[in-house]
Amino acid sequence: MACKVKWPFFTIGALGLGTLAFAGPIGKFLMTIKLLQPYQFRRIEAWLNPESDPTDKGFQVLQGLYAIGSGGLVGQGLGESIQKLGFLPESQNDMIFAIICEELGLFGAVSIILIFLFMIYRFMLIANNAPDLFGALLVVGVMGHIAIQVILNIAVVTNTIPNTGITLPFISYGGTSVLFLLMEMGIVLSVSNQIKLEK
């Protein structure tokens, strides 16, 4: 018998992600009551207004936005990015989504997002049909980890939140990150393998 995960668990996670929408007002509030250190204040200020310091604090964000903007609808072409040639710092890690937008355009970026959404949908199906609660919770944990990484990376690249240094799962360069993601996928596939199909 399948373990039917109650979807209110997912709504709690969605509410947690919804608090990201209030990151700006919360940051301004913390600055006004002096809870932030000066370097933290400068980082948030560079996030809110990257044009105020375009050669230092706002450089990476602005170059990422230039890459996204220069991609247009269909992009420059695969491998034809200009920003990855030293203009955009960490273009292979934190800012890989900006390079995807530049090379593949809006259609490529939307395709990547749709692939991640489909993966998350499949995680939900596996969690919903898992044979026991433990397996369902394992899958929900992996799903949450990957979903949060995707949301944070894309939000940083589009300057929706301050820079966090989070990589884009399965796409960003990095040995340890990919290793742990593959281990997590192995856990999910193990739970999926235990699901009994109805005949």
What are these regions (language model features)?
Residues 149-199:
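A juxtamembrane structural motif centered on a specific transmembrane helix
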